[in-house]
Amino acid sequence: MTLLAIETSCDETSAAVIRDGVVLANVVSSQIKLHAEYGGVVPELAAREHLKNLLPVTQNALATAGVKPAELDAVAATQGPGLGIALLVGFKAAQAMAYALDKPFL
């Protein structure tokens, strides 16, 4: 089974490709510098950065793994715990990818 996993629970956007329990790629985009001036994570800023970073991070993970979207068996996303607005970005994006590819959403 080849799985695309999306993670956006806080201030890092991550996409991983896993095949039969082996991680083929794990790409992470950090927002530490963005939030540093505020002394902590600002949920609205985190969500906006996820929107900006999710597609390139996902494309990078798939390319690194050498997997085409049609070769995926399922798409998954973090459902919690985390910042609600940040989780929503990854959850809905992963749902949309699964729907577009006609694959199960986990």
Segments (PLM) and residue ranges:
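Short acidic/glycine-rich loops and adjacent helix/strand connectors
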Residues: 1-106
